[in-house]
Amino acid sequence: QQARKQTAKISKSQRAPKLKKLQAIVLCPTRELAIQVADEIRNLSRYMHGIKVLPIYGGQDIVKQIRSLKSGTQIVIGTPGRVMDHMRRKTMKLDFVHTVVLDEADEMLNMGFREDIEFVLSGVPEERQTVLFSATMPKPIMEITKKFQNNAKVIKVTKKELTVPNIEQYYYDVKPKKKEEVLSRLLDIYSPRLSVVFCNTKKQVDLLVNALLGRGYFAAGLHGDMKQEQRDRVMQGFRTGKTEILVATDVAARGIDVDEVEAVF
């Protein structure tokens, strides 16, 4: 569902599927989300002959990315830093770009991507559609909309319920020193097939993973300091069930889409 909303906004590329030039750019805060969005676009465009989609992000072989861009990629989904890198290298031609999507714009700003975003938006043709998705609309977001959007339409989506009815939720007031023990007991009591544990920092992720492994659990960590190969290996293990507990920072976990997750801590 997260990825489908972007796809609807870049449907303009349908009007020129035979044009082997870059026509749409989607900026995402994380590699995982970029990959997820790219996969969904591929699924929805598989019956449209000639549409070529490419996710680009740091930690991936840039030579392969350049080769793919030269081969006629029409839709790029990438992290701001890597897209900006290609623009500076002049390996990404922007003359035919007519759509730019900023996904999770507030999160990208929280991660320090404001200058990168403005660099990208300043480099694409002025005659374009710029679409911005954001859970919140703080002042920095409004400044970007005023600077790079003309007569923008604001669409607010609200829900009467913030939670899904069939998900049970519990709150435990636990002292910091007791969190590891309580988590272990909850894992033993409920025995979820797959579970995700969120931590605030990368250090906390590493410490908790080591503690869980020491207790005999099949756990693995995911955070921004890991190389892409490591992240891919961790996610593959989690999807196949080899890893039962994924410990991650909130940013690193964005874009994770695994149906069998039964518990989130």
Provide a role label for each language-model segment:
Residues 1-265:
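Conserved helicase RecA-like core
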